[in-house]
Amino acid sequence: MTMISVNEFKNGLTIEYNNDLWRIVEFQHVKPGKGSAFVRSKLKSLRTGAVQEYTFRSTAKVNTADIQTKAMQYLYNDGTSFVFMDTNTYEQLEIPEAQVERESKFLKENMVVNVITHEGETLGVDLPNTVDLEVAETEPNIKGDTSSGGGKPATMETGLVVNVPFFINQGDVLTINTADGTYVSRANK
């Protein structure tokens, strides 16, 4: 744990603030014409997943959090928790559903993700930037149905609903952005 000035903020940095652990989502240095400079930031709680905006004076200092990440393989969901396995020791770890609620729509069995911990407390999982998911259900493509633009909804194998272009069919494997749950492209097979 190190004290840093808010002027040293970087996206992705984890800090301790108000008795919680926060990951910096975005920040902006503001120097108004009158008054002192400040840093406006969006922080995501690693414990609750809530995103909040905070403003710090440019002279403020905060503690960085010492978090650890460990690559683990997702095995299954038993209804109340998600079970992950350390691929080196074969030790299993159960994470309550509430801690991975947002990420659960992107998790496929046998997928390797980074599990985040702080002082022995499991905080959640870090997903890769994109994941490849198969389309489980979508409306069939109708020729010439491109005049309206946009797309159509498709339900992925994990239950995630994504707006996709009209040419996408059931069974296609798509690359999905995990940050916002949007369609990126067809996956290379």
Curated annotation (Swiss-Prot):
Presence of the UniProt keyword Zinc in the record: no
GO BP, sorted A to Z: peptide biosynthetic process
Residue ranges of the TM segments: none
Pathway: Protein biosynthesis; polypeptide chain elongation
Gene3D superfamilies with a match to the protein in the record: 2.30.30.30, Nucleic acid-binding proteins
Cellular localisation: Cytoplasm
Keyword Protein biosynthesis (UniProt): yes
Cellular component aspect of the GO annotation: cytoplasm
Cysteines joined through disulfide linkages: none
Signal peptide: none
Keywords: Cytoplasm, Elongation factor, Protein biosynthesis
GO molecular function, one term: translation elongation factor activity
HAMAP family according to UniProt: EF_P (MF_00141)
Family of the protein in this entry: Belongs to the elongation factor P family.
Function: Involved in peptide bond synthesis. Stimulates efficient translation and peptide-bond synthesis on native or reconstituted 70S ribosomes in vitro. Probably functions indirectly by altering the affinity of the ribosome for aminoacyl-tRNA, thus increasing their reactivity as acceptors for peptidyl transferase.
Protein name: Elongation factor P 2
Gene assigned in the entry: efp2
